[in-house]
C-alpha cells in the first residue's frame, strides 16, 4: 500500500514538470522600461515583433493586453504592434519609496491560446522636491552647553528614489553653529548642529537659522526649514547692587516700620536664576538685627525698634543678596545709617463735642466740632498749627491757644454731596516738623428743598370713547431728589369743574402709583378733549409739589347711526311722497334724502344707495352716492308703474357701519293731472335759471382770487429763495399724526402753521393750516397700555378758533359738504409740503356706480378741518358732481348755487370754501349785487334764498 502511494506521487511530480516545460515553451517574457510622467503615446516597445507575431494575425488571434491593477496605463496599437503609454504614470503613486518599480502585463492571443508575460520597468525622474515635515523647528539649548555639543535635526524626505533622493544639507551662515551630516545604513543622511561658539542668553536670547536640503536630480530641487534656537538661561551672573556702599541719614525716634532705605540689586539672568533674596550678613551683630529688619523680597530696610541718637549715632549694616540659581550666587553691599537729633514728640489731636448730622440748610458759621491739639516738646518744636482737608465747605477757626472750632464755611447740598470725610492735620514747628491727623466724618441730613419733578410738563393721551369704567388711561411719574419721607411722592387731581360736573367724576389718580383711570365711559360727541392737571406732592414738612398737564383726546367710535332729517314732504324718518311728470327726461332730480350722523370723521361720512327692487321690476331712478339726490336714469314711459316705492339705505363709513332706511313714494302723473306741481315747477324754474349766471360769475370770481393768491405765493417764494440760505431753512418738518380713524385719513394736526419750502430758500410760514388748537405735546396712543412719549413739549395749548365752529343746525345742512381733509391734502414732498385746494369738477355725466372719492357726510364738526400728511391721492368730487353750496366760515349763511337745467344728467354735490370774515362779507355783497342785476335783466321777481 505504501509503495503504491509512492509511485503515484512520483507520477504526479513528473506530470507537473512536463506541464511547466510545455508552458515555458508556449509562453515568453519581455522586459521594457519607461520613465514616469511620460506623455500619452510615448513609445515603449515593439511588443508584437518581440513576441514573434505577425501584424496581420494580431486581430484574428484576438491579441490583447491584461493587467490586474494597471491595465489602463499601457496599451498596444494593433495596427503596428507598438506598446505605448496610454495614461499618466506616477512612480511614487505606484511603488512608493521602493527602489524597483515595474508594471506586469499579460499578453494573450488565441488560436492557439498563448500567454506572454511582459514587465515594464518604471524609471524615476526628479519630479519631487525635498520636503520637511514642519516649516519651523524649535530647539531649546541652555547657554551653559559646552563647545562641540551636537544637536540632531529632523531631516527632509524626497519621494523620489536613487540619485534623485540623495539629499545634501546646507546651513545659513552664522557664528555659533556648523552643520554635520550623519550617514545612516540605508544611505539616508540626517543633519546635526554642532556648537562652535559659546551661547550667551543675555546677549542673544534666540537665533534664527535656515536649513536647506538639495536633492541629486537634474535639475535639482531644494526645500528649506526655519530653525528657531531658544537660548535657555543658566545661572552665570551674580546679583549686583547699584553701589557697594549706601549712606543714609535719618532722625532719631523714628516709628516702627519707618523705611530706612530700599536696596536695589539686579541680575542679568532670567527665570528662577533672576529671583533674589535680601538678608543681613552674618557679620551684623544682634543689636542691629533688633533695631532694623530687612524685607527679603523688596530689599527694604525698616526700623524695627526705637533708635535713639543718644544710644548710638551710627549703624553699619552688611547686606547680602542671593539668587535662586543652582548653585546660588551672592552679591554684597554695606549700609551706613547716620542718626540726626530731632524733635522726637509728635503733636496730639483730640476732637470733641461733635454736632452730627448737620442739616443741609444749616447757616454758615454753624459750629460742627471742637478740636484741641498738644505737643510735649518745647520751644518751636512745641508750637502746633492745624489745617483741614482742602476743597470742603468747612474751616477751622482758632478760638484759643491750641483750641480750634470746626465751623460751616459755605452752604451744603445733600443732593450733591451727602457726607464728608474731613482730615484735621496738626503740625509742630520742629525741623523737620512732626504732625498728627484726626478724621472727622460729617453726615449731611436732608431737608425738603426739592419739589417732585415730572419728565415733561404736559402729555397728550388718546382714548377711544365708550371705554369701560376704571379704564387705565395713563401713568404719571415724578421724581424727587430728596431722601426718605421727603422723597415719597403722592399724586392727586387738581380739581376743577367741567360744565356742571366736577373733574373727579370723569377721572381719578392712584395716589401711590400715579395711574390715571377713567371713572365712566367717555363720549366723543359730548367731550372731545379732557384737559386737567395732576399734582405730585412729597412727604416733607412743609410738602412741595408740582403739576402736570394731561390732555386726553377722546377718539370717536362709530356708535351713532345716521339720522334722517325732516323734509318738506314728510316727517323725519317717515315716507316722503313726490309727484313726477312722466315727461321729465333723464337726470331730473325727483327728491333728496337728507341725513346726519352725530359721529365724526369717517364715522360720519354718509353714503346713499337704492335698495334693489323686486325681480323683473324696472326702476328708472337712482340715488347719488354721497348727495342723496334721487334722479331719473332715463326718460319715463308708459311701462313704468305709476307708483314707485323707493327704499334708500343710508350708511356711514365706520367699522362696522351703521345704517338707516328712508322710504320715498314717487307718483308718476301726466302733465294735466298735476297743475299744482306744474305751477310750483314754473315758479321755481325762473330763480334757478337766474341762479345759473350767478354761479358762473361766482366761480369766475373765486378762480380769479385763487389765481392771484397762487401768483402771490410764487412771487413770495421766489423772493425768499433768492435770499441767503439759512441752516435749517428747508429742513424736513416732522409731522405729528395725533388722531387717526380706522381708515387712516382723518387726523389732527399738531402745528397751526405749516412750512412751505422751495429749493434751498428760507422756510415759509405764510400758508395757514386750519386745524384745531392742539398743543405740541408728546403723542401717546392709549389702547389699554401706556405708550412711549416723545415730541416737543415747549409750547402751550391754544384755544380753537371760534370762527370754525358750527351750530347743530348748520351741521345738519352740511350733510354732503366737502371737508378740507378730503379736498386739500398737504403732502410732504422733496421740495417741501405741497397743498392742494378744493376744486369744482367738470360737469360730466357721472358713471352708473355713482360719484367717486366723495366728500364726508354731515355731522362732522369743525375740529376735523385739517391738512393731511403723507402720500396718497387726494379725494375729489366725482366727475358728475357740481357743488351746490358754499359754506362761508365765520358766517352761518349757506349760499345756494343749485342749478337744474332741463335734460341735465349732472348730479349735485356740495363743497365748502374758506377764508376770512371780511372777504366773506365782500363776497356775499357781490353775490347779492349780481343776483339783483340778473333779476332785473330777466324780469324774475322771486329768488330762492332758502339756503342762505
Curated annotation (Swiss-Prot):
Its biological purpose? Potential calcium-dependent cell-adhesion protein. May be involved in the establishment and maintenance of specific neuronal connections in the brain.
Q: Does this UniProt record's set of keywords contain rRNA-binding?
A: no
List the membrane topology term(s): Single-pass type I membrane protein
A GO molecular-function annotation: calcium ion binding
The gene that this protein is the product of is: PCDHA10
Could you confirm whether the keyword Glycoprotein appears in this record?
Answer: yes
From the UniProt entry, list the residue stretches annotated as the region 6 X 4 AA repeats of P-X-X-P.
732-892
Q: Membrane-spanning regions, if any?
A: 696-716
In this chain the Cadherin domain maps to: 29-132, 133-241, 242-349, 350-454, 455-564, 587-689
Q: Where is this region: Disordered?
A: 783-804, 827-948
Q: List the disulfide bonds.
A: none
Which compartment or compartments is the protein found in?
A: Cell membrane
Start-end of the PXXP repeats?
Answer: 732-735, 772-775, 797-800, 830-833, 871-874, 889-892
Q: What is this protein called?
A: Protocadherin alpha-10
Q: Compositional bias (Basic and acidic residues) at which positions?
A: 907-921
Q: Which PANTHER family does the record match to this protein?
A: CADHERIN-87A, PROTOCADHERIN ALPHA-10
User: Which InterPro entries would you find in this protein's record?
Assistant: Cadherin-like_dom, Cadherin-like_sf, Cadherin_CBD, Cadherin_CS, Cadherin_N, Protocadherin/Cadherin-CA
Note the Pfam families from the entry.
Cadherin (PF00028), Cadherin_2 (PF08266), Cadherin_tail (PF15974)
| Organism of this sequence | Pan troglodytes (Chimpanzee)
Question: Can you tell me which residues are glycosylated?
Answer: 256, 264, 547
Membrane topology (Extracellular): 29-695
Q: Which UniProt keywords apply?
A: Calcium, Cell adhesion, Cell membrane, Glycoprotein, Membrane, Repeat, Signal, Transmembrane, Transmembrane helix
